[in-house]
Amino acid sequence: MSRQTDMDPGTYVPDIGGLRFWDMWKEVVFVFVNDTKQKHGGGSETGAGAFFPQYSKYPAMAARSKTKFLGELLILSRFHKYNPVFTTFAGDRTISTAFVFQQTALCVLAAYLFCGAGMVWNDWIDRDIDAKVARTKHRPLAMGSVTTTEAMVWMTLQVIMSWGVLRVMLDNKDVLKHLIPVMVASVLYPFGKRYLARKLMIYPQYILAFTIAWPAIPGRAAICGRHESFTETTRQCLPLCIMVFFWTIYLNTAYSYQDVVDDRKLKVNSFYNIAGNHIHVLLVLLVSPIILAQFDPKQPASGGTLHKSNFILGVWTILACAAEVFLTSA
């Protein structure tokens, strides 16, 4: 089956062929659970211990149900929270709104799945460290409620699904060029927290910032990629990627500071180590260029735009706080 786009009349983009990734995943889980249970002869034991007897000595695993297990996988990929997934789209006005929304949905899905896989990889590499940090000790791998084998299977499924969606979104054009850079960065990210990386003045925020800024490129390619080269797409997205790169360094430096006490005990590498006791000054220096860049003295109207963005930020902050209060009270 094919679908026609408004990008170029008469040209077809391969459809996903009726495949529904969620249905496929449910089928995989069903077959996996039943096959494993049959291999171990079923039995009266319930939960993970019924078909993973070797893990019965771990209470978190032995007591879990199938529903709990699936829930742990979702938590492992942070699907129960917001994710730092960044996508962007650009194109002339001759492109239909329906096509843009279609590509947007595919791009968000691909990025969300890949981000989830990256979370699993990070937690697998850091599982021993996470177990010693107050904020992260309850993560599934750190507390032992999910095995490393299960985590790797889950991660692989997410990567495969993300790759499949990306192929459809990009009409199978330059897929590896879009995927490999962010995949390599995702693999390297947790190792940026190690002591050796600090010696080399490599901080995990550099690597993470790249992985969050890069999706701007496949995002634009989803709309304009059929009419421009990969090099041109990258060139057009470069200013935006640079902005997101530095913004993410600021954002994640502030975020990771939550773990400063435990991280310093464990000698975990992070960008805030540069600042020492002057972390607030560092954060101000990081964010100031982005804010100042919004004002152009040659364009007086930019002052109004800056004021408007500040107002929108205030409204957004109020709504976010209200939502958090509501969710907390609920």
From Swiss-Prot:
EC number of the protein: 2.5.1.-
Q: Which residues cross the membrane?
A: 105-125, 146-166, 175-192, 199-219, 237-257, 273-293, 310-330
Q: How is it used?
A: Diterpenoid pyrones display various biological activities and FDDP E shows anti-HIV activity. FDDP D and FDDP E show also inhibitory activity of 42-mer-amyloid beta aggregation that is involved in the pathogenesis of Alzheimer's disease.
* Keywords recorded for this protein, A-Z: Glycoprotein, Membrane, Transferase, Transmembrane, Transmembrane helix
Q: Which cofactor does it need?
A: Mg(2+)
**Annotated membrane topology:** Multi-pass membrane protein
Recorded GO molecular functions are: transferase activity, transferring alkyl or aryl (other than methyl) groups
Pathway(s) annotated for this protein in UniProt? Secondary metabolite biosynthesis; terpenoid biosynthesis
* Cellular location(s): Membrane
Task: Read off the CDD domains from this record.
Answer: PT_UbiA_COQ2
Q: Name one GO cellular component term.
A: plasma membrane
Sugar-bearing residue positions = 34
Please tell me where this protein is predominantly located: membrane
Give, as one word, the top-level EC class: transferase
One GO biological process this protein is involved in is: terpenoid biosynthetic process
| InterPro entries in alphabetical order | Prenyltransferase, UbiA_prenyltransferase, UbiA_prenylTrfase_CS, UbiA_sf
Family per record: Belongs to the UbiA prenyltransferase family.
Briefly state the protein's biological role.
Polyprenyl transferase; part of the gene cluster that mediates the biosynthesis of diterpenoid pyrones. The first step of the pathway is the synthesis of the alpha-pyrone moiety by the polyketide synthase dpfgA via condensation of one acetyl-CoA starter unit with 3 malonyl-CoA units and 2 methylations. The alpha-pyrone is then combined with geranylgeranyl pyrophosphate (GGPP) formed by the GGPP synthase dpfgD through the action of the prenyltransferase dpfgC to yield a linear alpha-pyrone diterpenoid.
Q: Could you tell me which PANTHER family the record lists for this protein? A: 4-HYDROXYBENZOATE POLYPRENYLTRANSFERASE, MITOCHONDRIAL, PRENYLTRANSFERASES
Question: Per its record, how is this protein called by name?
Answer: Polyprenyl transferase dpfgC
Gene this protein is translated from: dpfgC
